[in-house]
Every structure is written in C-alpha cells, then in structure tokens.
Amino acid sequence: LTGGSTPYGYDYDRPIVIINTMRVNGIHVINEGQQIIGLSGSTLFGLENLLEPYGREPHSVIGSSCIGASIVGGLCNNSGGALVKRGPAYTELSLYAKITDDGELVLVNDIGIDLGNNPEEILTNLEQKKYSTHQIKYPKKRASDNTYHKRVRDVDADTPARFNADGRRLYAASGCAGKIAVFAVRLDTYKAPKRSQVFYVGSNAANTFTHIRRSILSEFKTLPSSGEYLHRDCYDAAKKYSKDTFVVIDKLGPNFIPKLFGFKRKIDLLAEKFSILPIKFSDKLMQFLSYFWPNHLPKRMEMYRDKYEHHWVIEMADDGIDEAKLFFADFFKSNEGNFFLSTHIISILCIFQNICIR
C-alpha cells in the first residue's frame, strides 16, 4: 500500500543501488538457544525451525506483516505491531556499516563478539562462524524490548505504548529503516508456550473493543501473545487476495514458502522477456488459479463476517487461555457481540497476515 521501505518511484535525487542479501542467510544459535545471531538475509522461517529443538521461539513467527520476512528487515522497521506481550523488534547488539559525518565509510561492531580488527576479518569470521564461546561477550545491552509489557499495561498514559519512529526504540540497526547497512543482529529468543488458543471476537460497536482492550491490558495476569483488528472490508480483501498464499501454506506447509518465492522469481524473470505478459505475472497467475479453489475459510468465520462489522483476533497462551475464556463469557452477557474459540488457527492468522503481502 505504501511502497514499503525499499526504493520506490523515480524521483530520487541520486543514483540507487539495490543489494539482495537473501543468500547471506546464516543463523547462529548461542547461549543454549536463549539468543541468536541473524545475518542480513536470514528469515523467520529458518529461525523458527532452528529454535524448535530448544523449546524457544523467535520474536515473530512467520512475520507480523508479511510472509517470508527477514530477521534484519523486521528489526530495521521495529516490526511486531500485533505482538502485545513482546512489543517491537529491538536490539542494541548489531554489526553494521555507516557513513560518518566526515563522509567516511566505517564498520561498527556492536554485536558483542570479538571477531577481529579489520572489516574483512570481522565479516569473514562472523559469516563462517569462526569464533568460540569465550569470544562472546554479554554487555549490559538489550537484545529485545524487555520492558514493553510494562508500557502496554499503562492504558491511561498520555502517549501510546508504541508508534512509528518511537525514539525510545531507535538504536543503531533497530528502526534504522535502511539508513545504515546491517550485516548481522543479535536477538533474544522466547520460551515457547505449552498451549495456545486463538479467540475470534466480533462486534458492531467499536467501543466494545475499547472496553475489552482496557480490561485485558490492565486486569489480566497474562497478556495476549498477539492481537489484530480487522474491519469487515479488510476481511473481504484478505479473503480474496490472500487465498492463493493460504492454500499453499495449508496444503504444503509454511516451510514450502521460501521455495515458492524462489519459483515465483524465476517465473517473473522469464515472463519479463515476453511483452505480452503482465508485470508480477506469477502473482496474477496464482490469484487467478485460486478463484477455482473452494472457499478456504471456516463457516463460523464467514457467519461472523456477515453478522459483525468489527473483528478481533486475539491469541492467548498457557494460563491466559482460561483467564480469557472466563472474561469473554462474562463480558458478552451484558455487551453487544460474541466470540468463539478457533480450531483453525492457521487460517485466522493468514487472513490478517497475508493482507500485507501484496
């Protein structure tokens, strides 16, 4: 919708160089899975698979705003808008290049690992993982926004818990939005919940959601893992334009997505050689074919779409599940709207995540 953070348009005042870093995709698990080092092109897909044996999770699963998101890309944009408990992606430990005020190009090693003295040595040692555990330092710097859960509970504060270009969470690579060249970041991981449950909430009164939000944030012992609002119009758009990606994830699994993107790139490069074929041919082809697939959304979701204008997808974990069940059952006895427990977590997550893909 906005062009994203990549170069967009033709009105720049200088030449532009675009570097695809997706093949620099190494991920190093350190401190028994409690932290990771993600290189420029490493993805959340790859990280999720690496952390599973440790019983840990990355900051985001799949990606809060797009399928196939990179770790570094999310950090550079302070991503994680739907994450209530974890907040925005943030770290004070990274390896990056910048232009100084004097116009000099320098490499800054703030990642907390002794990798050498000159840029070539530092980058080579990191990419090839030529460092030992005693070279990893643990400075008094954050590798996540570990105070966000306190800010988000302050529902009467004059400022929002988070917003674009929040100076509290702009630090080197974090929130840099492409103004520096990030080679690697160091991030905390999170203990995977034993149980998770998605609550699908519907109402025709926006104020109902305001009451729910304030109650959950200020009164619940356990914060939601995530929460995402959908208007009925957004629901319809996601249903139509995200159907192709959903079908792939549902039938082939999320691990197939990187292969799908690689195949799509090859198709688009081939299509560019034929003037009769449209730009982004693979996207248009997939969406066209998806029209022949049966409705992929559960009937109960469709019923809520027809009945309610406002929709809210809330994911709770562990003790928060029972807490939310009791709250919603009591709340809707005297308030307009209703809720149900979703048994189709993937489809619900896709409907609000995929809307940002295009």
PLM region spans:
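Noncatalytic alpha-helical scaffold of FAD-dependent oxidoreductases
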Residues: L1-R358
